Amino acid sequence: MINEVKSDAQSRMDKSVEAFRSQLSKIRTGRAHPSLLDGIMVPYYGSNTPLRQVGNVSTEDARTLTVTVFDASLIKAVEKAIMGSSLGLNPMSAGTVIRIPLPPLTEERRRDLIKIVRGEAENSRIAIRNIRRDANNDLKLLEKDKDISEDEQRVGEELVQKTTNDHIKQIEDLLVVKEAELLEV
C-alpha cells in the first residue's frame, strides 16, 4: 500500500516537472526554436486551431523561424495570430512561407523573463509540495484505518519526502539552465 501511494505521488510529480519543462519551452530565449510558437492558435473554419496543425514550423537560422502554411488562404490569419501573441514578433510573408525574425532580447526583457521563469519554478515547487501533502495524508489515513503501522507510515513519509526532494532538484536544475540561456548574449 505504501508503494501505491508513493508511485501515485511520483507519477503526479513527474507530470508537474513535465508541465514546468513545457512552460519553459514557450519562454523565448535569444535563439529561434519551433516550440516558441506552440501556444499560438489560428482561427480556421470557425474554431481556433494550433499553428502546428495549419503549417510546418521550422528554424531557418539562429534568429529566424519559418512557417510553411498548408493552405495559402490562411497566411493573413497566421500572420495576425503571430502578431497578436505576447511574443512581440513581426512576421513577414513570402508566398506560402512566413519568415519570423526574432529581435535580440534587451537586458530589461531578459530580467523580466527571468522573473517569469522563477515564478513558474515556484509554482511547480508548490504543486510538488501539495502532492507530497496529499500522499502523507493518504498514509495517515491508512495508519488510522490500521492498514499500516506507525513505523510503516513513517517509512512511507520518508520515501515520499525523498521523491519530493528529487523532483524539486529537477525543477532547480531546469531553472538554472533556462536562466543561463536567458542571460546568454
UniProtKB/Swiss-Prot annotation:
This is Ribosome-recycling factor. It is found in: Cytoplasm. It comes from the Bacteria. Keywords: Cytoplasm, Protein biosynthesis. Coiled coil: none annotated. One of its GO terms (molecular function) is ribosomal large subunit binding. Signal peptide: none annotated.
